[in-house]
Amino acid sequence: MCIRDRGLQVMREGATSVKKYSFELGGNAPVIVMPDVDLDEVAANIVAKKTGFAGQTCVNYNRIYVQERIYPQLCEKVAEKLRAVKLGRWKDEGQVMGPLINKKARDRMLELVDDAVKSGAKLVMGGEVPEDFAKGAYMTPALLVDVTDDMRVSREEIFGPIIPMQPFKTLDEAIEKANNTIYGLSSYFFGHNAKEIAKAFEGMEAGEIFINGSGGTEQVP
C-alpha cells in the first residue's frame, strides 16, 4: 500500500468522528526546465536538492523534464556537478552526501535504477554501493537520462539520490506530463518568460508550485 492510500484509509476510518487531519504524505514532484535558464545555476540546484539529505525529502525533485534544445547540455552540467559530490559525514568538508536512512531504503534505490536501465534509460553515473562505505546505507548518487513516464522511477516517489531526466518539446506537453501522477504535493518550474510562468502556474496541479527555486514551509517540510 502506497503512502497516498494510507492517508485515504485513515480518512475513511475516521469519517464517523469529527476529526481534523493534517497529513504528512509522499510526493512525486515534477520539474519543468525551459531553455532560457542559466544552465549552471539550474544544474547546481538540481544536484544540491537531490544530494541534500540524500534526497530524502517528500517535496524533492522526482521527474525532471527539460526542453529538448537544452537537454543534452543540462544533462552534461548535472553530471559535471554531481562528480564533485563526495560521500561522507556531515562534518566532512566540501559538498558531501550522507547515507540513506537504512539499507532497505538504499536497496530500493538500486532496484529503481536497475528497473530504469532495463526499461531503456541510460545510467550516466552512480547507482552503486561504494566499497569504502559498504557497511553503511550509502550509495553513489545516480544520474539517469532518457527516462520515460512508464518506468517505476517516474511513477513512484523516489525519496533518494536518483536524478531522472527526460526531454520535452512544448510547454503544454511538459505540463501534461507533470500532472500525470496520483500525487500532488509540489511542482517546480524554471524559466523567465512571464507568459510561460503564468501558464505553468495555472496548469500545474500541486499543493505548492515553486518558480525558479525550491524551498519548504512548516506545513510542507
Show the residue positions of the predicted features.
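Flexible low-complexity scaffold tracts in large eukaryotic assembly proteins
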Residues: 1-2, 161
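ALDH superfamily catalytic-core signature
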Residues: 4-148, 171-172, 177, 211, ...
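Short, conserved phosphate/pyrophosphate- and ester-handling motifs at nucleotide-, phospho-/glycolipid
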Residues: 67, 161, 193
